[in-house]
């Protein structure tokens, strides 16, 4: 935080300020880590599989310390992208340009979302050539996302993230089948 407001780590300070650091043990830090891990995972999927073969990667719901999602195919994600410390860049573009960008990338859900957006500008994040939209802050580069695992789960995958109280430890809990079934049915019903 800079003078009590959340700021991204790559912002330059131009005046004396009161600084306090956010960690993954707090809500704001954990959400930043979570968004960044999802973004890194999406980049890895698109790096491994040609874009035209991916119809959609869908992030569905939180399950314990993991995020459940689905895509067609068995796609491995390794740690090479994380270790490369690729910068996560943010740029602000016109909303109409965002509609065009996501249409070009085949991200039709986001293309439709921005057609109805009233704000004139949209923040787009990129890792290398891969671009996407996220609401909220991101880490400055991929090396910050050190602790995660990606495991198969039902028809999709579970992106396991660190336990909030111990940000260097990723648990591999057994999936509670009844809870999964309820969340999955609920998500499908609302889709």
What is each model feature region?
Residues 3, 11-32, 44, 53-191:
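Auxiliary tRNA-acceptor-end handling modules of aminoacyl-tRNA synthetases
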Residues 37-50:
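Short amphipathic alpha-helix segments
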């Amino acid at each position: 935080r800079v003078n009590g407001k959340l700021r991204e780590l790559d912002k330059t300070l131009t005046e004396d300020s009161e600084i306090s650091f956010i960690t993954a043990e707090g809500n704001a830090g954990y959400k930043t880590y979570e968004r960044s891990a999802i973004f890194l995972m999406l980049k890895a999927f698109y790096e491994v599989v040609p874009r035209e073969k991916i119809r959609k990667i869908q992030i569905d719901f939180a399950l314990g310390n993991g995020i459940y999602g689905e895509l067609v195919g068995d796609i491995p994600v390794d740690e090479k992208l994380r270790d490369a410390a690729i910068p996560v860049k943010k740029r602000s573009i016109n909303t109409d340009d965002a509609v065009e960008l996501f249409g070009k990338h085949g991200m039709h859900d986001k293309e439709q979302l921005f057609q109805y957006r009233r704000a004139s500008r949209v923040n787009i994040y990129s890792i290398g050539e891969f671009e996407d939209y996220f609401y909220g802050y991101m880490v400055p580069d991929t090396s910050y996302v050190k602790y995660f695992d990606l495991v198969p789960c039902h028809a999709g995958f579970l992106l396991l993230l660190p336990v909030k109280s111990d940000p260097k430890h990723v648990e591999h809990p057994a999936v509670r089948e009844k809870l999964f079934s309820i969340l999955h049915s609920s998500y499908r019903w609302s889709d």
